[in-house]
Amino acid sequence: MTDEPLVLGIETSCDETGVGVVRGRTLLANEIASSVDLHARFGGVVPEVASRAHLEALVPTMHRALEKAGLRLADVDAIAVTAGPGLAGTLLVGVAAAKAYALALGKPLFGVNHLAAHVAVDILEHGPLPRPCVALLVSGGHSSLLLVEDVTGTVRPLGSTVDDAAGEAFDKVARVLGLPFPGGPPIDRAAQEGDPQFVAFPRGKADDGTFDFSFAGLKTAVARWVEKRERDGEPVPVADVAAAFQEAVADVLTAKAVAACRTYGVGDLLIGGGVAANSRLRSLAAERCEAAGIRLRVPRPGLCTDNGAMVAALGACLIKAGRTPSEPEFPADSSLPITEVLV
């Protein structure tokens, strides 16, 4: 296979149906169908609803991606699919489809780690990954710090959330403030008009000497503060609360990420995951990395959220590294550890 393999990637770990096509490090197509509107009235992702949405959206999304890339499915060199972690039912939809296509076409199939794919996607924008680098991955389901020596096989977990992920906290605080689901974008927009110093919300595990995160206490503190204002008959300054909450999240995430770089003598920090689209997280990370002499890499927002291009990018990296394709009977694994980049 060539050094620039043509790879189709399938992503169904949560509520986005993603199909991407890459040629080596070149992005050819990245099509996404989101079921977020179906989950909005529940205030969170409903696994059964998400699984059914994937069943309906996967084939049309694949057709759009192939059309955008100007290819037929038979043209691809390999197929990559998210095998985990994620929601068990939604993962099964993507894995089953990928296996069927690979078998029918006689193509090699790579079952890959969702978190490692969030790291690998940066090659599509900024070129080969530095070795080593620290990766901060922040989404609705994950808040993790990783030491990435080689995204195709040597990834070491440094810390993770001990309770709520940052994205989950955004969703719950948005609900408290009467903002729509998912909470990240509306909180970011509201915060533009607010004062980040309006309330000094707590920073969980900020000074505990670990690289773990905790956002449950912050989420609860915001809810209690809002409840007290409402009991007292006072208006809730949504923009100020959003800005103060967002500042607390960005403060902890960036402080620990920079500390991890210093501790391990690493000069490059990569930030990925859906929350990486947050404007304050990006700006504060840039400020702190510049002050610490650390090079910062953050993909554009469209590559930070769950998508098929990131899966295809990791597949291309694995092929270039000479990794053997997955066995046909590999399972979807909702709790796949980051140490298993390829199943």
Swiss-Prot record:
Cofactor notes: Binds 1 Fe(2+) ion per subunit.
GO process terms (BP): tRNA threonylcarbamoyladenosine modification
Physiological role: Required for the formation of a threonylcarbamoyl group on adenosine at position 37 (t(6)A37) in tRNAs that read codons beginning with adenine. Is involved in the transfer of the threonylcarbamoyl moiety of threonylcarbamoyl-AMP (TC-AMP) to the N6 group of A37, together with TsaE and TsaB. TsaD likely plays a direct catalytic role in this reaction.
Recorded catalytic activity of this chain's protein: L-threonylcarbamoyladenylate + adenosine(37) in tRNA = N(6)-L-threonylcarbamoyladenosine(37) in tRNA + AMP + H(+)
Keyword Ribonucleoprotein applies: no
Family annotation (HAMAP family): TsaD
Localization, UniProt: Cytoplasm
CDD domains to which the protein is assigned, alphabetical: ASKHA_NBD_TsaD_bac
Gene name linked to the record: tsaD
Name under which the protein is recorded: tRNA N6-adenosine threonylcarbamoyltransferase
NCBIfam families hit by this protein: gcp_kae1, T6A_TsaD_YgjD
Cofactor(s) named in the record: Fe(2+)
